[in-house]
Amino acid sequence: MKKYLLFVLVAFLAVTSASAQMRIRMGKNSPIEKLGRAEIAIANLYVDSVDENKLVEDAIRGMLEKLDPHSSYTTAKETQAMNESLNGSFDGIGVQFNMVDDSLLVIQPVVNGPSEKVGIIAGDRIVAVNDTAIAGVKMSKEEIMKRLRGPKGTIVNLTVVRRGIKDKLSFRVKRDKIPVTTMDAAYMIRPGIGYIRLGSFGMTSHKEVSVAMDSLKKKGMKDLIFDLQDNGGGYLQTAAKIANEFLEKGDLIVYTNGRTAPRQEFRAEANGRWRKGKLVVLTNEFSASAAEIVSGAIQDQDRGVVVGRRTFGKGLVQRPLTFEDGSEIRLTIAHYYTPSGRCIQKPYKKGEREDYAMDLDNRYKHGEFTNQDSIHLSDSLKYYTLRKHRVVYGGGGIMPDYFVPLDTTKYTKMHRLLTAKSIVINHSLKFIDAHRQELKSQYKDFGKFLATYEVPQSLVEEIIADGKKEKIEPRDAAELAQTKKYLSIQLKALVARDIWDMSQYFQVWNETNEIVMRAVKLLTTGK
């Protein structure tokens, strides 16, 4: 490690920066030479032993912290986990699970996945992996996942407890590639109006959205609500492909510009397949990066309108620079700009990450989430859309065409605490585990469930009682009534998710989402 650091730094920078024609200044007083000497001196001369790997990692993080808020360093393990969520697959056994009473409860096996193929079903409890008990031993979720995952083709032996069967069951599961979907929901929210919710922009997102659009068109969709609320972004190429489907060939989607990265434009490569029909894009303060690229392009090209609240404002182009050990630097090299010229990135000061991290809190305190008039926009931030020349504003993030305030009264403090303490989800999972077959038998059709099912009030009362044990109590009768009302809806959505899928969850929950309902009103009434 002693002399290796200097070599690695030079070789790494020489390779990764060649395309930008950057020059590394070497010599007795060069920054790189100084950094290498410092590390070697500490490793060899410091009074106590040091972890050289941690020393170098901390030095890298220290340098990046002086830059913009999003340049970052991740370890090999962190990099792998981050990439898996976007790359479309990972190797494993293919189950969605949750921990209940210190045991692993299977929520759903992945369709055609390794576990479903050998007969594992929803409601099974996995109690041992390769003869190692995982139930009743206080094992972390991360440790359990490590035991369940493994290279494709390898075998894992599972011991399962199934409701109604006295003896434990044994399954021999061959690990395989497990798809990671990024689309949360797709359904007809009203006659003629389709709804798609995308959670992130991953490798498979364009295909997922394409399949959903084709399916919804067959069901009579003429207009679309494209929900990007809470979408934290993902791959630029995926965002460009999806935006392309709504635009005409040659339309500008986004461009980038930076000190060492000259302007690069991303345009629609062909006429999109979904250019007709009204389009409403939904955003909120947690919509970021690729979600802002798509919503900004749709708005600037006058293809549709944006409904909701101002987006996060993350518009930095980052280049991944990977080390041989799998760790990675993600270095900001440019900014994203919408077709009208708005910079998506909100303002920041180099090195002041704490202030930047408090931005959403400050926006909330200043009333931006609840009152549109609290957002003060100067004429210098004024831009115009490309076709209808409507006024839109820059300054960071995408400002919606139709503002929807955050309802701060809907979820009471009591409700938030019951959810945060996992009291709601734990009771929900136990209830579903006990009544799964009964519910499946009674509600073979989701439409019937949506229209007629009501959560037993005894379940709500059990949650309230457990909350009381944790000193979670209502301020008054009004708060208790409000808490019970939305607990019932939340529990119905959770039951729908675990009996069917996330799409059914959102079909229940969206009827209480003000931004979604505003979009429905806009498409049905025109105002």
Regions found by a protein language model. Give the residues of each.
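Bacterial Sec-dependent N-terminal signal peptides
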Residues: 1-28
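Extended, small/polar residue-biased N-terminal targeting/export presequences
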Residues: 46-107, 153-185, 509-520, 527
